[in-house]
């Protein structure tokens, strides 16, 4: 099987970030499947609040960090967005990073993994992200992962714990299989016929 390049995006800027556990879990599990996977941490990238999108800079004049992230997005075969929920909404850090780009996202599949400290598992944020990612030109797969309470599901090291962790381990293969099917289909189609725009 071909090795697919998958970017995992995570967006909390908080000091005591819990969602990084889920991001690390996903990166590790995709690595076991032979994927070339990289975590893109919005806090580490540290983009300013959106003023100009990457595409609005003259060619070669965008800040280096935008050039680097744009290149990684263009080279990826698929994406996973690890999303937390803030007051029924999306995390501003991840949304800010995502909004800096547009055409770079086009014609690739994406999956959503949500989490929260509570029992609702960030599902309201996942619902909001679904429409956003579709509008940005991605095909969002139907399988999702929803983790909550995250502190009772994953250890600090990102290992599954307890009954919630067992449920996550059981759900992950279908989630990954769904994304990988679409990743492979999109890659074949890209080779067969260039995207129309």
Feature-to-residue mapping (PLM):
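Short clusters of hydrophobic/aromatic residues that line enzyme substrate/ligand-binding pockets
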Residues: 47-50, 147, 154
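Amphipathic alpha-helix from the class-I
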Residues: 152-159
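N-terminal beta1-alpha1-beta2 submodule of the flavodoxin-like/Rossmannoid cofactor-binding fold
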Residues: 1-96, 103, 160-197
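Short, glycine-/small-residue-rich phosphate/pyrophosphate-handling segment
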Residues: 110-152, 167-170
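Short, solvent-exposed amphipathic alpha-helical segments in soluble enzyme
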Residues: 24-25, 98, 128-131
